[in-house]
Design a protein with these regions (language model features):
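Extended terminal and domain-junction accessory segments
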Residues: 2-175, 228-232, 240-254
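Intrinsic, low-complexity N-terminal interaction/targeting segments
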Residues: 157, 166-168, 189-192, 196-213, ...
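Short solvent-exposed loop/turn micro-motifs enriched in small/polar/acidic residues
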Residues: 1, 161, 205-206, 218
């Protein structure tokens, strides 16, 4: 669901643009060329990689060694200093794990892309030219947790699937900070319709402006939003089967 603007100065030859699925069962390709009919070589698919607990939990430096997946609590992350609070609604059948000390770094390539011999673009590499659109600081904060139960295959926010949830309310033209905390072992690209999300570094500096923000397993991110568009907006995981299973909220700007 993410989009990127890329500026290139091509030579008089063809270039393959190649995207492969996470499970390496297929790919999509396009050709950038100076004229119709030019073709370039298509790379081979990478070999499938089995996902380990470390892959799914984002290289938490051994903190998962004593984890019992039937318990799902108290999982420590290297480098994290602040424990978090979980909503009461997270303690129910829709949530099978909670991350108490998430990681906050933005330079992890993600599942299946670590140490593969190629340079991989991360959020730490991205910088929006010109800085934030709104120079105001945040007037308030909202923290939400991305939650799920992998055995039941339900996905939710703060332990509530969409049908059980109430809208998130933004005041018109306010500037606020949103904190997303991933309590699952899956990556969730969160897309907020109608409004821009301005990602911050762990120490609160502006990094990049996005409409969809990828939240990795056991990760905590924060971003600033200016609620300048009146109306009712969808906010959901852009893995559509996660959205359909409940990881969806309505945002009301009024």
């Amino acid at each position: 669901a993410e989009t990127y603007d890329v500026i290139v100065t091509p030579k008089d030859e063809a270039y393959t643009i190649f995207a492969q699925s996470m499970d390496r069962t297929g790919f999509a390709r396009g050709t950038l060329a100076a004229r119709a009919g030019m073709m370039a070589a298509v790379p081979a698919l990478d070999k499938p990689e089995p996902l380990t607990m470390g892959d799914m939990m984002g290289d938490m430096s051994g903190a998962m060694g004593a984890m019992d997946h039937s318990m799902h609590a108290g999982m420590a992350a290297a480098g994290a200093s602040t424990r978090v609070r979980h909503a009461r609604t997270e303690y129910g059948p829709s949530v099978d794990m909670r991350v108490d000390t998430p990681r906050t770094n933005l330079d992890d390539p993600g599942i299946g892309l670590r140490n593969n011999g190629r340079r991989v673009l991360t959020y730490a590499d991205l910088h929006t030219v010109g800085g934030p659109m709104d120079k105001r600081g945040a007037g308030r904060e909202i923290e939400l947790h991305l939650t799920g139960n992998m055995e039941r295959y339900t996905w939710s926010i703060d332990g509530l699937e969409f049908g059980k949830s109430t809208p998130v309310h933004f005041r018109h033209n306010e500037r606020l900070r949103v904190i997303l905390h991933n309590d699952t072992m899956m990556t969730h690209p969160m897309h907020m319709h109608g409004l821009w999300s301005e990602l911050e570094t762990p120490d609160g500096r502006f990094q990049v402006r996005k409409h969809t923000l990828n939240v990795q397993p056991a990760q905590r991110i924060s971003f600033l939003v200016t609620a300048d568009a009146l109306g009712r907006w969808a906010w959901h995981c852009h893995l559509m089967y996660h959205m359909d299973a409940g990881m969806f909220r309505e945002v009301v700007v009024a």
